[in-house]
Amino acid sequence: MKKLIAATLAFAMILPMAACKPKVEPGDANRYKTYANMTPEQIVAQLTLEQKAAQMVQPAIYKTSNDDMRENGYGSVLSTAGHTNAEEWRKIVDGFQQASLESPSGIPFIYGQDDVHGVNYCVNAVYFPHNIGIGAANDEELTYKMGQITADEAKLCHMMWNFSPVVAQSVDPRWGRTYESYGSDLEIIKKLSTAYTKGLIDKGLVACAKHFFADGNVVYGTGEQGATPMLIDRGDAKLSESEINELLKVYQAQIDAGVQTIMISHSSLNGVKMHENKEYIMKLKNEMGFKGFIVSDWGSVENITGASYKEKVIKSVNAGIDMLMETDRFEEARQIIIDAVKNKEISEERVNDAVARIIKVKKDAGLFDDPMLANMKTEQTETGSLEYRKVAEQLVEKSLVLLKNDKNTLPFKQGTKVYITGSAANDGSVQCGGWTLDWNRATTSEIQGVTTIQEAFERYAKDYGIEVITDAKEASKADVVLLCVGEQAYAEWNGDTEDLSLTGALGLADNRDAMNAAEKLGKPIVTCIVAGRHIIINEDDYKKWDSVVMCYLPGSEGKGISDVLCGCADFSGKLPSPWYGSIDQIGTDKCFLKKGYGLSYGDGFTARKEPETVLDSASKAAAHPSDGTNYTKGLFKDGVYVNSYSGITAKIPGECKQAPESELSENRDYHISKCTNAKDKARESATFYDASFTESMGGFDFKFVNTKLAAPDDPAYDENKYLDEYGTFVKGLYKGFPITVEYKGRDKAVLGGKEYVRDTFTLSGNEGTQTICIYARKLDDNLMSVVEIYWFGKKTAEDYEKLFG
């Protein structure tokens, strides 16, 4: 279903392009050695117009292949390959690099990635607190170390270009990217972002200050209104000249620190889209001394003014953008640049300057001396080292802001029995927030290398001298309740909201239930808020809490929280922005708590010995929903999928590709992550994929549901009950997308001689309509067989059902 959603939105799936094209013969892979002794300008003089235009575009990894790189020699590739460890990342990047060296130009490429709080697309890397927490910590030295560690772990993945830091000034917490900002204080933003950038650069990485500029100053209600309407993200910043100059000082500090690239903002400034704002883009180069290159943001060229895509590409290049992050339309953009130069709509001097800047950055990064990074040096040999985790742990400790501590409930004293409750206590995805293993959020709550708050308390309870209780039935035995509430994980406009309350659309589903249950216990309550911004706190709830700690999005090291709450370190974090008491206060001088507020344990506090950090287990294996059943794994051979247990035999169309096992697990995790109630979570946790086959316009999913786990209290749970629940769940998956979901009805259908109950849906968007058929058949007391078929076009369900024999 995760891929189904992607197909519906984009009408394109991850397809191996090489399967559609003849193999490209490699050229001389050693030309980079000659280039190494030439200036960027001399190298540019050797290139054809076509080769120069290729350096100016940046495809997404899932839209290109090694053969495409070998044929065209693109300047860069970006985005994620999924849940991938450092070793696999190296293979991926090295494959593209070898192909780039064998391309007609022979220019090394550079891989770009949004490593915004550590190398967050790498499994078992260190995930630091997001920037809002770094702003609360306000520790220049540790932020510099964070940059160094991020660079070192990125190099272990051979990802040499980091789209970070975000240097936005966040002024409205309704903005979904608030947590990516260091706060609202420009001096703190300038100090910390510069320290971080220096850390990246000093360890050999290419940094990228973003998003130029005023992306955090946009006015609520002016959000971009494209295929997905946004409330505030990518909106319009209405600023005076003096306000603009203050924001530019942050970028001047980045340039002075040596930042090599700058990314343009999706947003507008006083009504002008930044991607076409030549005045300010060229100001970077002509007045502020920027010698690196300018990159556009994801697909943003399409959203500027212009009668055609051609006009928009030409306008953005002429405005001063050197590399176009046109992830899907990169080939079209490349050809437009070529034709525009020939037609004198873009000067060749403009192209030469852009490519020289791109090559300079690559040369300075050492890619012309050692493109395969064979001689690259790193401090660590693997990601996620204990040494690096300790630095992240320190930042977590310093980022915590104590809002309230009535009766000195904190720190927990030795002998205290602590009952831990609330969804934020034991969910790695919530704790790490967006941009973790995936763009919007990690699709699983159990993330390798992440120690949750609850796990930290349990792991070090003996060291702290406390007893941890997690069973609600035993809660009455506790002396104090540790209530962990917060927000769902989100990224960009998905976090835009007009309701900042803990029980609003982006609050965790059980926040209210957990708060009510904690109150009923009649014990002192310590509340930890795990969120990417200052949410609006209900006044009555706040009064009932004895202590309140703002944790922001702490990342992988939950021990930083348990250490401080158990008295191994004091609170030192301060609010990096005002904390508003209501929506009406936003943008005014009124607030609940002022910027810079933060309590400590006070005079006389003596820190206890901190327990030695223990690395998280390499994996967190959970019971599989097939355990205890007679399930057998299906087989796929010679284009035919067979599962003897369900009795299904299906001829899979040749254009469909079988998904790897890792993707099947990811799809299941994705569904579980989207559950907002206990019934959905039980059902999706009881569901597992046997096989999945996809092509660009549709596919087949074969699943099983353990009905005893899905509905343990309902022995009569059948196909109709499943489809009723699952159909409602499917509709919810598309909420917020520009898609209309229509239920077409339920009937019976035969798959391979077996009768199934079939539900049919259509999903309609700007590009057309997709049909989804969901088939269910109960096999025995334990398992139900579920088949999903989805497609675009005029075919009928019966056309696909004929493939089953």
Regions found by a protein language model. Name each.
Residues 1-4, 8-9:
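Positively charged n-region of N-terminal signal peptides that target proteins for export
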Residues 9, 13, 17, 402-405:
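Hydrophobic core
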